[in-house]
Amino acid sequence: MPNTNNPYRCIGKGFCGSVWAAEDGTNHAIKREDGGPGRSVTNDYNMHLQIIRSANQHRPSMPLAIPQCQSLIYSNNMWWIENLHRFPAGFTECRALISERIPKIPRSISDKIVDLFCSDTSLSAFVKGNEDDDCCLIRPYLGRRRGREANTSRFQRFSLRNVPLHINQMEDLGLDYVAYAQTMADALAMMHWGAKVDANDVEFVLAPPRASSSSSFPSHYLGKHVMWILDFDCVRHMSMDEAGLKQACAAFMRNDPFYPRPDGTESADGALWWLFRHRFLQTSAEILGDGSPHAGLPRRLMELIEEEGCRRRKKKEEIQERDEDTEQD
């Protein structure tokens, strides 16, 4: 039996709220609604359930996982009488979402990540021994390359709780980023056409699979892992029309650079975009089915994203040209 006196500790913070868990053998996490205004764990809960239902109906073929959504707790729920004392002094009751905890990256692997990206031995030792950096999850950024000139001081500004792993770093480590792109394409198609939501601000992380999982990405560097989707508090319903597509396009471009982008800086980025695009259209067609009145929407969405990517690339080139002209003057 879990120890109900075992204290919760904060394992993450976001604009919606803080995330807590106890090292007592349970596998749940508590997301408190104590963040910025306008964010709602109630919406998180409802969208989470809707996406789980869609995933159950359209089973992904890739190693994709969604945390189980267990319960929504209100501030007057009896749960707080039994558990409030497990939070630090001064914390009060609030709405909270209880869901399955994503397994953390083992220390042996997160230590290798520190060695790879941190050349400062004193800082490296601190991060390896820091309890706050114990809950390591990896954010796969297929839409961004990290500059080779990145230095140690930049490392000091991010936590092992959410390590950004950029596409060129995946290439260097021999990770199967093509499979990651296919998995994201499947997930996006499932959310848009199965759950009918815009997928706004959802996050993808690489982490170990559930003990019961039969599918995973093999990797000598990261060990067996899967791709998890989380954070649904900003997700909204989308209509199956042009307005809904524009909403989905804006969400795609606004999100952190998890997905491949059509405006990448290298030829390999363009190839990965086309692979992602092809997989998204293929999976979308399977979900919508033959004869669907919405059959043309997935391709139109890709067109909107490509148009926006082209606009952003041109704007970036214009800024670079102005900067070069200024330097010459």
Where would I find each of the regions flagged by the language model?
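ATP-binding glycine-rich loop module of kinase domains
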Residues: 9-77, 82-87, 97
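Conserved beta-strand elements of beta-rich interaction domains across eukaryotes
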Residues: 26-27, 34-37, 103-104, 209, ...
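Short amphipathic alpha-helical segments
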Residues: 40-43, 176-183
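Short, hydrophobic/amphipathic alpha-helical packing segments
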Residues: 180-192
